[in-house]
């Protein structure tokens, strides 16, 4: 191979040098870079997994939030319906009480009016009785006087016949 210009000593030295450089590059450059790339890949993978977990947690939280919101809306609607029902019942009770009060006032007023009517009738009867007695007294006095005058005249006339 010397005819070809190959120097075996130099070729072996160069081969050793290449193997040594490959070993050096592999040991001090390729493996650390490969390790760094693997670590970075792992961190990216963990970040993606964390992001996926966070996305799932966020989806679960949103689902829970939506469920709680729906439940709260339902409870609010129920509370509102109950409040409206209580308000209707109270309004009905207030109206019924007002009707009862109005009826009581009406009956009290009618009773007072009847009492006043009875009192006035009693006073009227008393006054009428007084007027009847007074009128009867006057009539009787007038009749007695007329009868008395007539009797006196008749007696005088009778006496005049005897005279």
Curated annotation (Swiss-Prot):
Q: State the Gene3D superfamilies in the record.
A: 6.10.250.1580
Q: Which residues form a coiled coil?
A: none
Q: Where is the signal peptide?
A: none
| Top-level division of the source organism's lineage | Bacteria
Q: Where in the cell is it found?
A: Cell membrane
Extract the InterPro entries matched here.
Answer: ATP_synth_B-like_membr_sf, ATP_synth_b/b'su_bac/chlpt, ATP_synth_F0_bsu_bac, ATP_synthase_B_chain
Cellular compartments per GO CC: plasma membrane; proton-transporting ATP synthase complex
**What membrane topology was assigned to this protein in its record?**
Single-pass membrane protein
**Keyword field:** ATP synthesis, Cell membrane, CF(0), Hydrogen ion transport, Ion transport, Membrane, Transmembrane, Transmembrane helix, Transport
What interactions and quaternary structure are annotated?
F-type ATPases have 2 components, F(1) - the catalytic core - and F(0) - the membrane proton channel. F(1) has five subunits: alpha(3), beta(3), gamma(1), delta(1), epsilon(1). F(0) has four main subunits: a(1), b(2) and c(10-14). The alpha and beta chains form an alternating ring which encloses part of the gamma chain. F(1) is attached to F(0) by a central stalk formed by the gamma and epsilon chains, while a peripheral stalk is formed by the delta and b chains.
| Family to which this protein belongs | Belongs to the ATPase B chain family.
- So what does this one do? F(1)F(0) ATP synthase produces ATP from ADP in the presence of a proton or sodium gradient. F-type ATPases consist of two structural domains, F(1) containing the extramembraneous catalytic core and F(0) containing the membrane proton channel, linked together by a central stalk and a peripheral stalk. During catalysis, ATP synthesis in the catalytic domain of F(1) is coupled via a rotary mechanism of the central stalk subunits to proton translocation.
Q: Which NCBIfam families match?
A: ATP_synt_b, PRK14473.1
Protein name stated in the entry: ATP synthase subunit b
Q: Which organism is it from?
A: Roseiflexus castenholzii (strain DSM 13941 / HLO8)
